[in-house]
A protein has these predicted regions:
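Positively charged n-region of N-terminal signal peptides that target proteins for export
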Residues: 1-5
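Bacterial N-terminal signal peptides
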Residues: 6-15
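Sec/Tat signal peptide C-region and signal peptidase I cleavage site
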Residues: 16-20
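Post-signal peptide N-terminal segment of secreted/secretory-pathway proteins
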Residues: 23-24, 28, 55, 59-99, ...
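Amphipathic alpha-helical segments
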Residues: 43-57, 136-139, 202-218, 304
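Short, flexible, glycine-rich and Lys/Arg-enriched loop motifs at helix boundaries
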Residues: 64-79, 105, 224-241, 271, ...
Length: 344
């Protein structure tokens, strides 16, 4: 369960709604996002980090297909290397690291505050030992607006931290303190990705995109400010945590917290908008990739729902999946989403 809706609530005396529903197959999506794509400036350093600190392994590596380079409207002579990494034993929640060569780049969310909008704010991991990861990641120059925060949430005691690392990439890391975490047998250092967050300027527009257009279902909803002033991982001034409302929806094709998308808005905190920068080859959390049953169905749905199609379906090799049909759309806050059908 992703706990962003209580990041700045030290007490559990707040109201929230979790949408409980029977899991029903989505007619188009085969699940939540399969992978997040990171555009990085030093791929070797990042492979070392995910191997040594996250305890992940390399699943595939090679050059980015020229068909994808062309679809991204990059110069014809552009080349890029990619490495796909994952938590050993898991079948989803991967990270695809891409290093574009000799291109002009800026960070998508450079020096961003948590309330700045546009692009993808963070991706979420579980960890076994927050203190261990806190120390290790500081040694790799990851920093944050706060140290890890421990708090109670109903029957749970958790620790949470939002570190920022190279290329402006932000993690949301969660350790379950009590009761012991169950159902994560492959968690040794850092788990697979299970959620990604967008901070949006217009929460209704974002809900319309994911719920009304793509047919995602609600996993969790929360509205309100903190019940007490104090420390928080979002970097809000302690005296304003009770004055700034947050509105949060966690959404997924079948309403679970596995490859889900979280949309978050702030009422009373306004910052910069990075929507125009959330495009290749810029640096940071570049996009999410979702598996679909039929690429033609999602393409047709995009047209019917007036979703901006960045490029239409095309056949391309994409390891470790093999031959796929791939397309891309633009979502709220300029977010780049790709959908693929596996043909193998």
């Amino acid at each position: 369960m992703h706990l962003r809706f209580i990041f700045i609530i030290i007490s559990f005396l707040f109201s929230f709604t979790i949408k409980a529903n029977e899991l029903e197959a989505h007619p188009i999506f085969a699940g939540g996002y399969q992978e997040a794509v990171f555009s990085v400036s030093d791929i070797e350093a990042q492979v070392k980090f995910y191997t040594e600190v996250a305890g992940w392994e390399i699943l595939s590596e090679g050059n980015v297909s020229q068909r994808i380079i062309t679809a991204y409207s990059l110069p014809k002579n552009t080349t890029a290397r990619e490495v796909v990494m994952g938590n050993s034993g898991t079948k989803r929640g991967f990270i695809r690291l891409i290093e574009f060569v000799d291109v002009d780049q800026v960070q998508i969310r450079s020096s961003a505050q948590s309330w700045d909008t546009g692009g993808i704010f963070d991706v979420n991991f579980r960890v076994l030992s927050m203190q261990k990861k806190f120390k290790e990641m500081q040694e790799y120059d990851w920093q944050s607006a706060s140290d890890p925060v421990e708090f109670s949430f109903g029957p749970f005691v958790v620790k949470e931290w939002l570190p920022r690392g190279p290329d402006g990439i932000v993690f949301a890391m969660i350790e379950r303190v009590q009761p012991p975490l169950e159902g994560w047998p492959h968690l040794r250092e850092m788990s697979r990705l299970f959620n990604a967050t967008q901070v949006v300027a217009d929460i209704e527009e974002a809900k319309d995109f994911y719920i009304d257009k793509l047919g995602f279902k609600l996993y969790l909803e929360h509205k309100g400010a903190s019940s007490k002033e104090g420390p928080n991982v979002l970097g809000l001034p302690h005296n304003l945590t009770t004055k700034i409302d947050r509105e949060v929806y966690i959404l997924h094709p079948t309403g679970v917290n596995e490859g889900s998308v979280e949309i978050l808005s702030f009422d009373g905190a306004v910052g910069r908008d990075f929507s125009a920068l959330a495009v290749p080859p810029n640096l940071g959390i570049l996009m999410l990739r979702f598996p679909v049953y039929d690429i033609d169905d999602i393409h047709q749905l995009s047209i019917e729902k007036n979703i901006e199609v960045i490029f239409p379906p095309m056949k391309v090799g994409l390891e470790p999946y093999g031959e796929i049909d791939l397309m891309a759309v633009k979502g709220p806050g300029g977010v780049w989403l790709e959908f693929y059908e596996n043909n193998d």
